[in-house]
Amino acid sequence: MLITKTAFLAFLLSSVPLAHGAGGNSSSPDARGRRCVVRSSNGTADDSPEVSRVFAQCATNSVIVFQEGVDYNIFQPIKATNLSNVEIQMHGNLHLPQNISAVRDIVNAGTSTWFTLEGPRVDWTGPEDVNNGWIKSYGQAWWDANPPNGTGISGRPHLMSYKTSQATIKYFRSGKPIAWNMKLHGEDIAVSHAIVDASSTGSFPFNTDAFDVQGTNIRISDSIMYNGDDAIAVGSDSHNIVFERNTIGYQSHGMSIGSLGKDASAFANITNLRFEDVTVIDALYAARFKSWTGGQGLVKNVTWKNIRVYNVTFPIFVTQSYYDQSVSRDGVDTESSVMMEDFTWEDFSGSINSYQPGDGSCATDPCWYNAGLPNLKHTEALVIECNTDKSCKNFVTKNIQLYPQVLEPASVICMKATAELNPNLGFNCSNGTFTSA
């Protein structure tokens, strides 16, 4: 399913209420006494020097304005890491270079991120008009340049690193990000009414994560993410994260925790996550946890609730033996795991993709997402792969109403979620027909 009309996006956004803060309030605009308008060359030159100049001169207590309907060429990376109490009014449209070789040269020289924004109380405000406020990255050409059985060409930039606190991000819009849309780090951040459109008309858009999140008190709501990787990926150390009233799809990899434990020496620490009232369309995954064999740490108190899925291959998926088709790992302790505790999956409804399961990210045989799964039927409502009989504790499922498109009974794959540690699991942990207890 492809996003082809901005009117459709506008309709979806207009159907949800405005979101409020995530626990902190950004500073009053009255304290931002300086208004700085970014001038545009109107397409005749590179506007990066002007943008960098304005960010440098107006780094504190300012409103930085990209004018509505105006185009800006951002042909060089922008780095503004000393911001404080700044509102970025993104009412224009930013255009990245369409010269793939030029961008790869910049990335290979050591600059991996196109926009780097850091500082407390850095707000981003786009316009309600869905035709403006876009960052246009022209990723389609990059995706189409990927060779057969490749997983994305080298030299792809991350679009944005956004590190802040006590901030709001409203009406952020990203069109065809090349890869890795936004790395969002910090505390007390509210994101609302964002659009990330990484749907492809050709080759698969590898690594087009929408939001990679790390921090405390972060809320993402009322947004649309169509992409070829995680809509949200929560990393360590993260606490009190909310993802609600969103629509995600295309060939999304869903609402994910991790991956965790790739570095066996790092202790993963994640608590209090809630994913609620989310629609998932044509995705590979809906709710997903992924950690590597040999990892260590604890993820505790996680809920996915009121999740509607349409044509999703794996609606509920847990693996403590995550596999990356581009990475080889040897010498890890196979009995070590990132521990999972107090996980709830509640009120799931909709259809399991039985007819055309999987997605375009398959570059190996077997596909990375099928590796290690016995006798897949693509009727599975749940896949629960615990690494040991002690690594999953207090798992709960309630009101799981998922049906395969072939209209057979839903099935389950479950490994080592023991009844002793999971008395309210809601079904028998075995491989076969899914039957609620």
From Swiss-Prot:
Source superkingdom: Eukaryota
Family: Belongs to the glycosyl hydrolase 28 family.
GO molecular function, one term: galacturan 1,4-alpha-galacturonidase activity
Function description: Specific in hydrolyzing the terminal glycosidic bond of polygalacturonic acid and oligogalacturonates.
Compartment(s): Secreted
Start-end of each PbH1 repeat: 215-236, 238-259, 270-291, 299-320
Disulphide-bonded residues: 386-392
Signal peptide start and end residues: 1-21
Reaction(s) catalysed by this chain's protein: [(1->4)-alpha-D-galacturonosyl](n) + H2O = alpha-D-galacturonate + [(1->4)-alpha-D-galacturonosyl](n-1)
Ranges that cross the membrane: none
Entry-listed glycosylation sites: 25, 42, 82, 99, 149, 269, 301, 311, 428, 431
Documented EC number(s): 3.2.1.67
Broad class of the protein's primary localization: secreted
Pfam family, one: Glyco_hydro_28
Full protein name: Probable exopolygalacturonase C
Active site location: 229, 253
Example GO BP: cell wall organization
Enzyme class: hydrolase
One cellular component (GO) term of this entry: extracellular region
Species whose genome carries this gene: Aspergillus oryzae (strain ATCC 42149 / RIB 40)
